[in-house]
Amino acid sequence: MQTETIHNIPYVNSNLTSFIDYLEKHYIDQKIGAVISTVNPEIAFAAIKDRDYFDVLSSSNFILPDGIGVVMMSRLTNNRLQSRIAGYDVFKELLGVANKKKKRIFLYGAKKDVIKGVVSKISSEYPNIKIAGYSDGYVQDRTLVAKQIARANPDMVFVALGYPHQEKFIHNYRHLFPKAVSIGLGGSFDVFSGNVKRAPSWMIRLNLEWFYRLILNPWRWKRMLSIPKYALTVLKEEKNKKTFYPKPEKDHTKQI
């Protein structure tokens, strides 16, 4: 699948429908495992500051531009990503695929009441999905959860621990469920369960979902400061024509 690279992070250059079709045909149907990371400017800037985290993201099979800021920066640096591919939308599309093909899934993350709400909604709306197991995100022993996932033998693993924890968890334990398609989903479980409202469709169309989140959670303004820092870093890099890290060789076994 075509990618476009922004400060050494190769983003999928596609749209939601085409990406899901590709994933279904080349990975899910073939029972080939894959790791999907969803990256917004905040996460990209975290990778700039943390080499270990950068290496974790780089080990992913697919890195999705989950943030209009990433798409905008691509256009300023002549990379031209087609569109934002939101993790929440990928989650719902994959549930549709799992329901159509009677796949097994494992859900990991969020609070106990939230994960139970997610399980209940999936059971109701996607009756052909086999929920092979689930765990809230507050279990202290993550190795125990990873072994639970391995025993469940799922086709898809959805991890909602927030960055960088979800990406590191998948990176560190993917060898225990190598045939599963695994994805980090941030706060998607909260939205799916109804505990948190997603932005209205018109705001999503206008790429204002970030602003809606800021209105609901004013404390996020400090996190938003990473966006201009990210932009300045990328533009400076483009001007100097250099990358902040050399491209690493993928090592799926290194523990982070």
Curated annotation (Swiss-Prot):
GO molecular function (one) = hexosyltransferase activity
Per its UniProt record, what InterPro entries does this chain match? TagA_TarA, WecG_TagA_CpsF
A single Gene Ontology biological process assigned to it is: teichoic acid biosynthetic process
Q: Which reaction does it catalyse?
A: UDP-N-acetyl-alpha-D-mannosamine + N-acetyl-alpha-D-glucosaminyl-di-trans,octa-cis-undecaprenyl diphosphate = N-acetyl-beta-D-mannosaminyl-(1->4)-N-acetyl-alpha-D-glucosaminyl di-trans,octa-cis-undecaprenyl diphosphate + UDP + H(+)
Transmembrane regions: none
Functional pathway: Cell wall biogenesis; poly(glycerol phosphate) teichoic acid biosynthesis
pH-linked activity: Optimum pH is 7-7.5.
Q: What class of enzyme is it?
A: transferase
Induction info reads: Positively regulated by WalR. Mainly expressed during exponential growth and rapidly shut off as cells enter the stationary phase.
Any single Pfam family the record assigns to this protein: Glyco_tran_WecG
Q: Which UniProt keywords apply?
A: Cell wall biogenesis/degradation, Glycosyltransferase, Teichoic acid biosynthesis, Transferase
UniProt-listed Enzyme Commission number(s)? 2.4.1.187
Null mutant: what phenotype? Not essential. Impaired growth. Looses rod shape of cells. No teichoic acid in cell walls.
Domain of life of the native organism: Bacteria
What does this gene product do? Catalyzes the conversion of GlcNAc-PP-undecaprenol into ManNAc-GlcNAc-PP-undecaprenol, the first committed lipid intermediate in the de novo synthesis of teichoic acid.
State the family named in the UniProt similarity comment for this chain. Belongs to the glycosyltransferase 26 family. TagA/TarA subfamily.
State the protein's name.
Answer: N-acetylglucosaminyldiphosphoundecaprenol N-acetyl-beta-D-mannosaminyltransferase
Gene name per UniProt: tagA
